[in-house]
Amino acid sequence: MPLGADNPAGGPVRNKPIRLADGRMLAPNSDESAEAWLPRVDESTDGGRTFRRLAPIPLNRTDEAAPDFMPGVGAIQPTLWESAPGRVHALLRTQAGRVYRSDSEDGGRTWSTAYPTALPNNNSGIDLAVDGDALYLALNPTTGTWGPRTPLVVMKSTDNGETFADFATLADDPIDDRHGREGQFCYPAIVARGGRLHITYTHNRKSIAYAEIRLREGRE
């Protein structure tokens, strides 16, 4: 990805870009420092050859009385999807004990202030794939602001991410120092292709694991 001096779209991109109905590509991104994690979205209009900063995803880190208040340093590693032309959504990794969400009605040019969902998140990476009308989210459903990255599961939504239900467990092994079991299954990447989910993730920080889940019979 070429990035010139006038194109400061670089950053720790973890999750995949998406292509919108209008042909543009959006890449989830963030600016990270010890003081603040600030999520944003970058845009490509030339098929991914170049990207530019498009818009920040606003966070409420000051008004503790508001329902969208986000404790901690902020949010990173958004995962994106488009539910209808121009309607784009993001789920965010946080230190707040929950996955947060933000929505855009104008193709990612502006975003709502991120707000908490019912999905637990202990500051671990997440990723989402779309198959038809269903969303599949890979995450560690662990409460708290820090903790074991186990189990690693896939959850399914059929109402555009308003609610999620258990779908599959990819790995579940509690931490056990006596037997060298670390229980670290994290940083998932998930795509839906040909009626199947394809997922990779870190296995105890020593190797990369791959899982395939068949959604329908045959290949499409």
Provide a role label for each language-model segment.
Residues 1-220:
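Asp-box/BNR beta-propeller blade signature and adjacent active/binding-site loops
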